[in-house]
């Protein structure tokens, strides 16, 4: 596995397992929204529901076209996230 995959896979897997809604921005500026259904080395399968059409669609998104993946909330189960920074204690000086 490539070194770059070591952060990407656990992050995407946590988004998938927790069914966290995401916004995926493509390099051409298009914003896609939905939940990550699956992914592999090259693609992300994004599941979206259209309220106006009352149906669910799945889109295959090639990773080389992705600029940014933005979760709608914090990801809790990613093992690569560092613990939150703590404020230094006041030593009274």
From Swiss-Prot:
Taxonomic superkingdom: Bacteria
Cross-referenced PROSITE patterns, in alphabetical order? SM (PS52002)
Q: Does the keyword RNA-binding apply?
A: yes
| Swiss-Prot/TrEMBL keywords | RNA-binding, Stress response
Q: Region Disordered: what ranges?
A: 73-93
Sm domain span: 9-75
List cellular component terms (GO).
Answer: cytosol
Q: Single Gene Ontology BP term? A: regulation of RNA stability
> What's a single GO MF annotation on this record?
RNA binding
Asked if the Swiss-Prot or TrEMBL record annotates the protein with the keyword Mitochondrion, the reply is no
Q: Which Pfam families does this chain map to?
A: Hfq (PF17209)
Q: May I ask which residue range the UniProt record assigns to the signal sequence? A: none
**Subunit relationships:** Homohexamer.
Family from the record: Belongs to the Hfq family.
Q: Give the matching NCBIfam families.
A: Hfq, PRK00395.1
Q: What does this protein do?
A: RNA chaperone that binds small regulatory RNA (sRNAs) and mRNAs to facilitate mRNA translational regulation in response to envelope stress, environmental stress and changes in metabolite concentrations. Also binds with high specificity to tRNAs.
Protein name (record): RNA-binding protein Hfq
Q: Specify the species.
A: Hamiltonella defensa subsp. Acyrthosiphon pisum (strain 5AT)
């Amino acid at each position: 596995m490539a070194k770059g995959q070591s952060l990407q896979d656990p992050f995407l897997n946590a988004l998938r397992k927790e069914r966290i809604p995401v916004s995926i921005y493509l390099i051409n500026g298009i914003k896609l929204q939905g939940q990550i259904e699956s992914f592999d080395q090259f693609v992300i399968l994004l599941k979206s529901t259209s309220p106006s059409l009352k149906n669910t669609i799945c889109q295959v998104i090639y990773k080389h076209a992705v600029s940014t993946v933005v979760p709608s909330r914090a990801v809790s189960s990613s093992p690569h996230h560092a613990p939150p920074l703590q404020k230094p204690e006041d030593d009274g000086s």
